[in-house]
A protein has these predicted regions:
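EF-hand and EF-hand-like Ca2+-sensor regions
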Residues: 61-193
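Eukaryote-specific detector of the first structured module of a protein
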Residues: 2-60, 70
Length: 193
């Protein structure tokens, strides 16, 4: 159940987009994302130029997401609307065929997770990313998920590069198989109620 397609999409909503935790996606969530991404990308500082870029990216992201998913045009995207948009625009598709808003967010997410900016998400960065969303009493649980996620090429390279991250993220959203390795992209998942 934790790795079902439905739960994976709910996970994305709760932990990546619904920043104000009100159960709906709206413009405020993306304004908050601009602030958060600026601070995370800048390692605690708040450069105005980086914020201006992030603010524009997140405003564009919200506008495109609202166009794709706000079916009733109320200025909010419900979980059901988001799921329907993902089914329509992402399911069964590769990263290259995702809407621009989704591709932009995926690329920004990679830069956020790649803490040391070496172009790879290694196990240490993966651990940091996982614990930022959920509690774990055993680091082995996280490491096991990372090992299930990585293929031989990832392990040989010392981590997951941007192209592979894009591929995995696309599979996380588009592949209904609960056993695909991409299910572990964000660590051991919890069931979202």
């Amino acid at each position: 159940m934790a790795y079902s397609w439905d739960n994976r999409v709910m996970y994305i909503i709760r932990y990546f987009y619904d920043i104000d935790n009100n159960g709906l996606l709206d413009k405020n969530d993306f304004e908050c994302l601009a602030v958060r991404n600026t601070i995370v990308e800048s390692r605690g500082t708040f450069p105005e130029d980086v914020f201006a870029t992030n603010k524009k990216v997140m405003a564009d992201l919200w506008n495109e997401l609202a166009e794709l998913a706000d079916f009733n045009k109320d200025g909010e995207v419900s979980a059901d609307e988001f799921k329907q948009a993902v089914k329509t625009h992402c399911q069964g598709k590769s990263y290259a065929n995702f809407p621009t808003a989704f591709r932009t967010f995926i690329d920004k997410q990679f830069r956020t997770v790649d803490v040391n900016a070496d172009g790879f998400v290694g196990v240490e960065e993966y651990r940091l990313d996982c614990i930022s969303r959920a509690g774990f009493s055993d680091v082995g649980e996280i490491d096991d998920a990372y090992n299930k996620l990585c293929n031989d090429a990832d392990k040989k390279a010392g981590g997951i590069n941007l192209a592979r991250y894009q591929e995995l993220y696309a599979q996380f959203l588009s592949n209904p198989d609960e056993k695909c390795s991409a299910c572990y992209l964000f660590g051991p998942l919890k069931v979202i109620e």
